[in-house]
């Protein structure tokens, strides 16, 4: 468990802090006239930063502030419908989620209709029966008394589809790690096919970046549907088809309505089981101008395998203990569905494995807190708080609340969310740089519980989420890019950096 605090770095923001710092004033006196000239020069802001970091020599030699800014791109693709809205705007969140779900449902229906026979051959016809039940195409009487059987079929189907995807991508990962002379003909063909997709993704990103100004944070790469769909499935389930009906694992699983029937009949919400269509590490490699060797591309592929395996482990965790609990609930009602069953197995929405967003009751526009909860089987969480008024960030690993999804006792490691939130508030208002009015509002907020603003799904592994967060805490170059623009923009950029990471080229 860990706890870290830091000041965010905004270009030019260090000048005021440095000039008013007693320690800095002593440094200036010791440095003499040379430093005074630098401080008074046009690059004063960069010079002050250089003094505090011990790099005044580079400033004196003429390095300017603009040179610190490079092209920064959020490692996400617009066409994948996974953008992060303003964390403090629930209305915007709701609209984006609804639009994304409508577009995704249309895409999933096309995939199921096109690859109907192949899905039956590979995963079994019983999964298509579940889809018909959920779409109202089958009579309700077919489900009565067989609810538990359908739940088990859906969970087994999810696991089978997930493991099939893991096996396919793992074969590609291992093939990329194998010496070229030792590869089989199938491995060579698999790598050749994936290289074609990767090069198409790489070229599309290069064209997109050419239109991006060097001093802008590109919110997201806007690529064509053809590039996204083909690159999203590293090793095709059934082989490539027309661009608008490429059968991705995510589309098959969503189109079969497996999560929906589990939620409807048991109250078990599995909406957090999502994998990025194109993993941020693959986008990062595609952004590089040089040719990517097989071993480096293999490590990017491995990142996606880790997410898939994490989701499969979570499905197994739900299947083993939760099915026993569900069966007991059904036995209480003669093995038939009853409206009380889902409510008995529901957990509080703030305890689900997502990124939960909070703000303070006062000065809400300047402060937001994210509580990131790991999949249920990991029993982990962390909190990261941002105070944009004083450019302060606070991180702490936190314990999770015990509930029915954990399937037993919960090990308590570290403090709870409320204690971590209180320390963040205490630390923020007690900083010497905190304006008096902001300090009063933070003190007032300290006595109240934070306001819940909603949640967002993350599509990378929990470990990757922690890694993204640590970069936000320590990487000053990244912070300068994330904190540019009016207040609304930094909030959205920070959320995107947390969920997907940002590449500073």
Curated annotation (Swiss-Prot):
Q: May I have one GO cellular component term?
A: viral outer capsid
Which UniProt key words apply to this protein? Capsid protein, Outer capsid protein, Viral penetration into host cytoplasm, Viral penetration via permeabilization of host membrane, Virion, Virus entry into host cell
| Organism, scientific name | African horse sickness virus 9 (AHSV-9)
Q: Please give one Gene Ontology molecular function term for this protein.
A: structural molecule activity
Task: Indicate the family of this protein.
Answer: Belongs to the orbivirus VP5 family.
Per the record, the major location class is virion
SS bond list: none
Which terms under GO biological process does the entry name? symbiont entry into host cell via permeabilization of host membrane
| InterPro entries named in the record | Capsid_VP5_Orbivir
Q: Which domain of life is it from?
A: Viruses
The protein's matches in Pfam families, at most eight in alphabetical order, are given as: Orbi_VP5 (PF00901)
This protein is called Outer capsid protein VP5
Gene name, per UniProt, is: Segment-6
């Amino acid at each position: 468990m860990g706890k870290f605090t830091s000041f965010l770095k905004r270009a030019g923001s260090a000048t005021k802090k440095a000039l008013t710092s007693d320690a800095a004033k002593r440094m200036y006196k010791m440095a003499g006239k040379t430093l005074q000239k630098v401080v008074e020069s046009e690059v004063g802001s960069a010079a002050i930063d250089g003094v505090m970091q011990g790099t005044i020599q580079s400033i004196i030699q003429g390095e300017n502030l603009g040179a610190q800014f490079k092209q920064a791109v959020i490692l996400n693709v617009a066409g994948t419908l996974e953008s992060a809205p303003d964390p403090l705007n629930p209305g915007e969140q709701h609209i984006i989620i609804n639009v994304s779900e409508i577009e995704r449902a249309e895409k999933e229906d096309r995939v199921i209709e096109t690859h109907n026979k192949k899905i039956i051959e590979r995963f079994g016809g019983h999964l298509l029966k579940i889809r018909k039940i959920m779409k109202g195409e089958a009579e309700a009487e077919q489900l009565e008394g067989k609810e538990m059987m359908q739940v088990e079929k859906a969970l087994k189907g999810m696991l089978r589809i997930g493991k099939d995807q893991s096996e396919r991508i793992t074969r590609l990962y291992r093939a990329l790690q194998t010496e070229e002379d030792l590869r089989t003909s199938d491995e060579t063909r698999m790598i050749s096919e994936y290289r074609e997709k990767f090069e198409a993704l790489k070229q599309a990103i290069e064209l997109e970046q050419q239109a991006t100004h060097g001093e802008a944070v590109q919110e997201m790469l806007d690529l064509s549907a053809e590039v996204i769909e083909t690159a999203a499935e590293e090793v095709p389930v059934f082989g490539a088809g027309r661009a608008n009906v490429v059968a991705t694992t995510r589309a098959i699983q969503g189109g079969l309505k497996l999560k929906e029937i589990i939620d409807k009949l048991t109250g078990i919400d599995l909406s957090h089981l999502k994998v990025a269509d194109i993993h941020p590490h693959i986008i990062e490699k595609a952004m590089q101008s040089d040719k990517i060797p097989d071993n480096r591309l293999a490590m990017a592929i491995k990142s996606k395998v880790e997410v898939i395996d994490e989701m499969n482990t979570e499905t197994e965790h739900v299947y083993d203990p939760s099915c026993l609990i569900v069966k007991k609930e059904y036995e209480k009602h003669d093995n038939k569905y009853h409206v009380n069953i889902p409510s008995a197995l529901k957990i509080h929405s703030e305890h689900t494995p997502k990124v939960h967003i909070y703000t303070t009751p006062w000065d809400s526009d300047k402060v937001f807190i994210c509580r990131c909860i790991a999949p249920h089987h990991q029993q982990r969480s962390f909190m990261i708080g941002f105070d944009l008024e004083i450019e302060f960030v606070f991180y702490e690993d936190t314990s999770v609340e015990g509930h029915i999804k954990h399937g037993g006792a919960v090990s308590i490691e570290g403090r709870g969310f409320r204690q971590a939130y209180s320390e963040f508030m205490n630390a923020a208002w007690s900083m010497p740089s905190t304006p008096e009015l902001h300090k009063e509002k933070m003190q007032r907020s300290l006595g109240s519980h934070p306001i819940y603003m909603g949640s967002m799904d993350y599509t990378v592994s929990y470990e990757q989420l922690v890694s993204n967060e640590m970069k936000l805490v320590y990487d000053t170059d990244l912070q300068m890019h994330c904190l540019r623009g009016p207040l609304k923009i930094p909030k959205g950029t920070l959320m995107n950096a947390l969920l997907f990471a940002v590449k500073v080229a």
